[in-house]
Amino acid sequence: MKNIVLIGSTGSIGRQTLEVIGSLPDRFKVVGLGSGKNWRLMAEQIRVFRPSAVAMAGEREIMNLKELLAGSYCPELGWGRTGMESLASMPEADLVVVAVTGFAGIYPTIAAIQAGKDVALANKETLVAAGHLVMKMAERHRAAILPVDSEHSAVWQCLCGRNSGEVEKIILTASGGPFREMCLEKLEKVTVDMALKHPNWNMGSKITIDSATLMNKGLEVIEAKWLFGLNYSQIEVVIHPQSIVHSAVEFLDGSVIAQMGLPDMRLPIQYALTYPERLPGSFPKLKLASLQGLTFEEPDTRRFPCLSLAFEAGLAGGTMPAVLNAANEVAVEFFLKGLLPFLGIPSVVRSVMEKHEMASDPGLEEIIEADRWARNMGVKVIRDLFN
């Protein structure tokens, strides 16, 4: 029995993680749950999984949760950054799943690593902003970082313990999003509802917008650099509209190993939870004979410049990836509120990056400060350019 702490339990990845855990009740026990503000769903999760500890974003959510749970089982409760960090470092936890979206995921991730816990990481921003610190910290505390993203899970499975010195390059696939074939003139008129309709994946709103701009793939490029110890010249992105090949690895001898499966996040989630074992899954399986065809093409960075911006930020290093991430989070937030056009997202990110005075070898506090600066600058840029 493996004891699981899940932070981000009410989000898309969190809910699917609990679905996987629920399908393997004799293998996993949920000992801790953390989430943002959805206290009603958290109450349901507590009733089903009966964790010993729970944390939420704020005290108000905890008070509402207490009231809803009155007269029934109530775990130990905490809130805010301190509550999440306590949850991530629970002594009884064997694996901490970090499924929080955004920069906030860095705090429980670091707390789990410092407590020597293995981390199943579904939060891109942690490695994007602080990959150089987090991977060194994980090595020092002997904590494993297990990728949950389908693309990184695919690369991990293709490598299968091989030395990165045998790798020529990795190939990250992207669906291309809902606007893969849309011209620039039409992209200028993209609405929020249009952008939230991903053709293949069922995801939260922020990552769905990132997929539409290709920023999601850009963040994954930076994440892959740290997860697998590669140079950016060894990371290639190709558009694969069917989302069946989740990524591939090309080795020095020219052979390519790819990982395939249906576009279902429960598959990489289950692999991260059960690793190093593979257990029977209760989810739909890929039938090769039913496939009509698999196609691949180069990404168009003229229409989708966020991918190029991510490579630029990664190559610059230092605080620049944190600035890229923070500016993007702000831009996506304003887009989702209808306060920024779709093509304004890369414009804001580029403008904030150009204004940033980069620190080349930042510590955690410098990264946090760069994140704060970029958010403030992002808001200023939006108000100056689009209002």
From Swiss-Prot:
The keyword NADP applies. Keywords: Isoprene biosynthesis, Manganese, Metal-binding, NADP, Oxidoreductase. GO terms for biological process: isopentenyl diphosphate biosynthetic process, methylerythritol 4-phosphate pathway involved in terpenoid biosynthetic process. One of its GO terms (molecular function) is manganese ion binding. Mn(2+) binds at residues 149, 151, 220. Belongs to the DXR family. This is 1-deoxy-D-xylulose 5-phosphate reductoisomerase.
